[in-house]
Regions:
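Nucleotide/phosphate-binding catalytic cleft detector across ATP-hydrolyzing
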Residues: 1-10, 16-130, 140-195
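Short acidic, Gly/Ser-rich segments with clustered Asp/Glu that frequently serve as metal-coordination loops
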Residues: 11-12, 135
């Protein structure tokens, strides 16, 4: 079976395609389209009609590829930019109607929880997995038998545009102080790889 995921992020829309069997999953292909939703959301507060049309056009291109590649199932997830825009529900409804497919806008904590699905994340104690996105940063810490997760409104685009808040940095600092036994920090996501 072929499956795909679509991530509507702050910097880009990304898709990954996988071949699955009952016992394995194999990466086949990836697509990335730099739409930059976050710059508009963090500067103007909402997504414009023009930006929504650009997003719809991109998603329709992905859908054509999924049809051509015989993808059996795919899910579209949206993160910081779509959850932070003041017209979030209107935008989602508009997009869903145009592409005839549901979009799930996930919370920052849901994003952090997803890190825990990586096989290494639940085997290695005292390590912090940090996903620095364009609009937010999610942290997953595993310390057998429990884990801790948190999300902060501190992403690369938000910081670059000087839309980060001192209060959020203080919240991050306070949260991290409870973990004095962290031995390693592992960075995840495109913003980390870009450096």
């Amino acid at each position: 079976m072929k499956i795909a995921s679509v991530d509507i992020g702050t910097n880009a829309v990304k898709s990954k395609i996988f071949e699955t069997t009952p016992t394995s999953i194999k990466f086949i292909d990836g697509i990335r389209s730099p739409i930059r939703l976050g710059a508009e959301v963090f500067e103007e507060g909402k997504l414009s009609d023009k930006k929504l049309r650009e997003l719809v056009s991109t998603l329709k291109r992905y859908q054509k590829k999924f049809t051509k590649d015989k993808i059996d199932q795919y899910e579209i997830i949206a993160t910081s930019a779509l959850r932070n825009t003041t017209n979030s529900e209107e935008a989602r409804t508009y997009i869903e109607n145009k592409i005839e497919h549901p979009i799930r806008i996930i919370s920052g904590l849901e994003e952090a929880q997803l890190i825990g699905f990586h096989p290494k994340a639940q085997k290695e104690n005292n390590k912090a997995y940090v996903d620095v996105g364009g609009g937010s940063t999610e942290i997953y810490i595993y310390n057998n038998p429990k884990h801790s997760i948190q999300s902060f409104q501190l992403g690369g685009v938000r910081i670059m545009l000087k839309k980060d808040k001192r209060k959020e940095w203080d919240r991050l600092d306070k949260w991290l102080k409870q973990f004095n036994d962290i031995t390693e920090i592992i960075g995840l996501g495109g913003n980390i790889r870009a450096f």
